[in-house]
């Protein structure tokens, strides 16, 4: 019974990885009722300078949030009216680099009607399960965020490591060439030339 109740109380969360080509824009839509809490968490995982333009618009085409060249972010708001909300990621500023963006759209519970709010007591177990569900969702999002950050930093470390190895090989070749050059020069310096 508790598991069924927990599954019913969990807020919906949609997590995605999306590839956005250069000069392109990708939009996602969520239909909610007025007063519903919504959140967007995003992170640019790969591509260029790891930046993306983000825009959230309401059903009335009113801008709720706009961010330019952001690499990650968290934004939470309450729906101001019933309708479809639009979440857009734009890579129009990039000339040739596609970006891979990880994002999660959290949709909270719809606000309860007046008749439910006037009840004398709310079930304590239901409240605790709801709090636990919210905490579990937050932990899941943080873990996904850390996985993306780890992937980014691993790529940077691998790139740096390969450059250091290549530079070391180059330095070794230069050292060998200089050694051979000095040996040749010193041999010629101490050679006795005979004039016949």
UniProtKB/Swiss-Prot annotation:
Stretches that traverse the bilayer: 164-184
Pfam families: EMP24_GP25L (PF01105)
Annotated PROSITE patterns: GOLD
Region described as Required for TMED10 and TMED2 cis-Golgi network localization: 113-152
Cellular component GO terms, alphabetical: COPI-coated vesicle; COPI-coated vesicle membrane; endoplasmic reticulum; endoplasmic reticulum membrane; endoplasmic reticulum-Golgi intermediate compartment; endoplasmic reticulum-Golgi intermediate compartment membrane; Golgi apparatus; Golgi cisterna membrane
Parts of the chain on the Lumenal side: 16-163
InterPro entries: Emp24-like, GOLD_dom, GOLD_dom_sf
Motif (COPI vesicle coat-binding): 189-196
Membrane topology term: Single-pass type I membrane protein
Major site of localization recorded for this protein: membrane
Domain GOLD: 25-107
Keywords: Coiled coil, Cytoplasmic vesicle, Endoplasmic reticulum, ER-Golgi transport, Golgi apparatus, Membrane, Protein transport, Signal, Transmembrane, Transmembrane helix, Transport
Motif (COPII vesicle coat-binding): 189-190
Parts of the chain on the Cytoplasmic side: 185-196
Subcellular location: Cytoplasmic vesicle membrane; Cytoplasmic vesicle, COPI-coated vesicle membrane; Golgi apparatus, cis-Golgi network membrane; Golgi apparatus, Golgi stack membrane
Residues of the signal peptide: 1-15
GO BP, one annotated term: protein localization to plasma membrane
Coiled-coil features, chain-numbered ranges: 112-162
Family membership noted in the UniProt record: Belongs to the EMP24/GP25L family.
Quaternary state and interactors: Monomer and homodimer in the endoplasmic reticulum, endoplasmic reticulum-Golgi intermediate compartment and Golgi. Probably oligomerizes with other members of the EMP24/GP25L family such as TMED7, TMED9 and TMED10. Interacts (via GOLD domain) with TMED10 (via GOLD domain). Associates with the COPI vesicle coat (coatomer); TMED10:TMED2 heterotetramers are proposed to be involved in coatomer association. Interacts (via C-terminus) with COPG1; the interaction involves dimeric TMED2. Interacts with SEC23A; indicative for an association of TMED2 with the COPII vesicle coat.
Function of the protein: Involved in vesicular protein trafficking. Mainly functions in the early secretory pathway but also in post-Golgi membranes. Thought to act as cargo receptor at the lumenal side for incorporation of secretory cargo molecules into transport vesicles and to be involved in vesicle coat formation at the cytoplasmic side.
Listed name of the protein: Transmembrane emp24 domain-containing protein 2
Organism: Cricetulus griseus (Chinese hamster)
């Amino acid at each position: 019974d508790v598991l069924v109740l927990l599954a019913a109380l969990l807020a919906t969360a949609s997590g995605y990885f999306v590839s956005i080509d250069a000069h392109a824009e990708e939009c996602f839509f969520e239909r909610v009722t007025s007063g519903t809490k919504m959140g967007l968490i995003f992170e640019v995982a790969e591509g260029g300078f790891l930046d993306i333009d983000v825009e959230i618009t309401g059903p009335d085409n009113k801008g709720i949030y706009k961010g330019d060249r952001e690499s990650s972010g968290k934004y939470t708001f309450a729906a101001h009216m019933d309708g479809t909300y639009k979440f857009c990621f734009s890579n129009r500023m990039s000339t040739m680099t596609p970006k891979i963006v990880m994002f999660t759209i959290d949709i909270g519970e719809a606000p309860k009607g007046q008749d439910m709010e006037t009840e004398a007591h709310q079930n304590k177990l239901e409240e605790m399960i709801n709090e636990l569900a919210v905490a579990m969702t937050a932990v899941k999002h943080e873990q996904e965020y850390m996985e993306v950050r780890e992937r980014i930093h691993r790529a940077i470390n691998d790139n740096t490591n390969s450059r250091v190895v290549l530079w070391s090989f180059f330095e070794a070749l230069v050292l060998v060439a200089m050694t051979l050059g000095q040996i040749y020069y010193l041999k010629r310096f101490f050679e006795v030339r005979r004039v016949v």
